[in-house]
Amino acid sequence: MIDRQKVRRTNPTMFSDCELTQMRSSRRDLLFAAPGAIAAAMVSGSSSVRAAAPIARLAGSHMKLSLAAYSFDRYLIKRGTPEQVAAAKMTIEQFIDYCAEINLDGTELTSYYFPIDIPPEYLASLKERCFRLGLDISGTAIGNDFCLPEGPKRNQNLMMCREWIDHAAMLGAPVIRIFAGSVPAGDSEEAARERCVAGINESLDYASQRGVFLALENHGGITSTSEQILKIIEGVKASPWFGVNLDGGNFKTPDPYFDLERIAPYTINAQLKATVFPNGIAEKADLQRVIAILKRANYRGYVVLEYEDQEDPRTAIPTLIQKMRDAIHSQES
């Protein structure tokens, strides 16, 4: 196996073609070995196999486009009453329509913008709307914190995750983006990580029963670096229903693209942003480069745009979607 840390020190911006070939060869070995190893562990009852093995891909890379409702955060109402939702600049239904208007394959119905009360009839109406418009519901997202210590707040986060697993199953949304959380004041990262892993494992038990994937996002806190998120992955029990949500703009490390390369093999959902932050300094994202990273990992699934910049999303998003579409097509040729 390549010592990627050593490669990073000697060349902070990229891997050589030779090194990338070696990495892909090692990754392929893991991918072909992973299904059998996991199956054997399930039969034997062994607990030694962890979820740290890269995702087993059954074919080459294939990517589809979606848009996160968070992209219209300035227009949508968070957990509003029916009256507040009706008065908003945009509703979830209008967001779905917008995704169809710009010819996306899917739409991410981020949980924050659902009304306070979510009856089954409401979820069914959204599912119907998406289907009639030819859109997949590519996923959803929750703002959980699994680093919290035992107590009411932690229980609320666990219950929220369970509730949204049910909602996702009803919607036909295959995956939920989940967060890890941050270290509470006066606590240690190791203790917070252990609680996070426990929360993921508990939630996975239910998610697997409902047929919903949980994708851990690199979202600051104890997932600020690839090293941190890999430590969490190593602690989570082996499950085909768990993986990473690769966020192209959340790493604020010296070389975010290097960190994205490290977590790409574990990715089951991906989202891109218009801006990256090497050393915390904003610069225009190299969308082609992020798509290439996913391509090398043989990623198959949705690439979701999550727009957060200052320009009005209605004018900025179509251009970004076209750039993403062009990047995907250039990688396929």
Name what the model sees in each region.
Residues 106-107, 197-293:
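Acidic/histidine-rich catalytic cores of soluble enzymes
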Residues 98-104, 170-171, 203-212, 296-299:
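A structural motif corresponding to the C-terminal end of an alpha-helix
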Residues 63-69, 107-109, 137-142, 176-178, ...:
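Hydrophobic faces of well-ordered beta-strands that scaffold small-molecule active sites
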Residues 15-170, 191, 198, 243, ...:
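N-terminal pre-domain/capping segments
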Residues 67, 99, 130, 168, ...:
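Conserved, mostly hydrophobic/aromatic
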Residues 115-116, 145-148, 183-186, 220-223, ...:
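Short, small-residue-enriched loops and turns at beta-alpha junctions
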Residues 58-59, 132-135, 206-212, 235-241, ...:
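Short helix-capping segments at alpha-helix termini
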Residues 168-188, 210-219:
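Active-site groove signature of glycoside hydrolases
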